[in-house]
């Protein structure tokens, strides 16, 4: 074995995420002197089937750090850092639970990411090249969450994310800069209508105006698109995160209590008024049937599962059997290792499910998911508004990849 690639030491650190919460960073060093780090993000709105985070009673991650510095360091020392599958399988066996509850999904994903980044660096490759090899041909379409509600903001909106999607552009940078124009236009509209106070940012960089009704938020976003002159190039989307406003039998939204069947009509009405290409988690995480009904009724819309699937093949299989969704969110920390993430993506692609690689609301400045999205040739990437360093780090990395490697932006070609 080449010592240059062998793991010499693995160390854990406690760091802060973008919400000021503690999370774990893992650093790997090889005998060849190569080192890299991986960070674990954290969500505010979580699916109940996600991998469990290992946290202290006070919210810290000192137990996770201790596990990295002892058990994981001892178990993975001398592994070839290029053996991603072998290392991830060791982490999975070490944990021994179906939801990573012993070692913690945050512990395993930070380690798994650090492994991939160290291997890429040791091989002299960009991370996206290491992941994707010669198949890398295009850059993903960004889904920019420019107006925040739900658990990501302090207003009364139930819908969590109001998204713009810059499809019809010849390059990634043109698409991103146009979306940024819309974002600035939206801030100007809100300043004029509600005052500058309400251009303060939510967790994912979007504005959080004092609204309570979904259509009022959609009107603001659509007006910003039209005022920017991009009505024929930028479409819209929402992440309802509807499990968060489902009371067990009804959805409490816009001052009303709607039955699950009434929610189908609710989304159909929204899609008739606005250019909604994308609807994520329109129903609670167990309602595969109504996901399917909505997807059948809105054939041109990408109904997408996040809490529905939680990057877990078993739930994706169920969704495919029921034709529940055209798209799936991919969040590596939901499943806990990159190898399981790659397996999930491969299965989704084989079944013609669109891939949306996604951040979490609690992020760090690590730009890894930008490389991941390019490497796996994700259709879309979801990483917040064009604001706040933990969001722009991902966009800036995509701009860097485009500039340095001339990789194309397929825009609406991916969808059409």
Swiss-Prot record:
GO terms for cellular component: cell surface; extracellular region; phosphopyruvate hydratase complex. It is an enzyme of class 4 (lyase). GO terms for biological process: glycolytic process. (2R)-2-phosphoglycerate binds at residues 160, 331, 360-361, 382. GO terms for molecular function: magnesium ion binding; phosphopyruvate hydratase activity. It comes from the Archaea. CDD domains: enolase. Disulfide bonds: none annotated. Pfam families: Enolase_C, Enolase_N. InterPro entries: Enolase, Enolase-like_C_sf, Enolase-like_N, Enolase_C, Enolase_CS, Enolase_N. Its cofactor is Mg(2+). It catalyses: (2R)-2-phosphoglycerate = phosphoenolpyruvate + H2O. Keywords: Cytoplasm, Glycolysis, Lyase, Magnesium, Metal-binding, Secreted. It is found in: Cytoplasm; Secreted; Cell surface. Its EC number is 4.2.1.11. The active site is at residues 204, 331. PROSITE patterns: ENOLASE. Binds a second Mg(2+) ion via substrate during catalysis. Its main location: cytoplasm. Belongs to the enolase family. Catalyzes the reversible conversion of 2-phosphoglycerate (2-PG) into phosphoenolpyruvate (PEP). It is essential for the degradation of carbohydrates via glycolysis. This is Enolase. It comes from Sulfurisphaera tokodaii (strain DSM 16993 / JCM 10545 / NBRC 100140 / 7). The gene is eno.
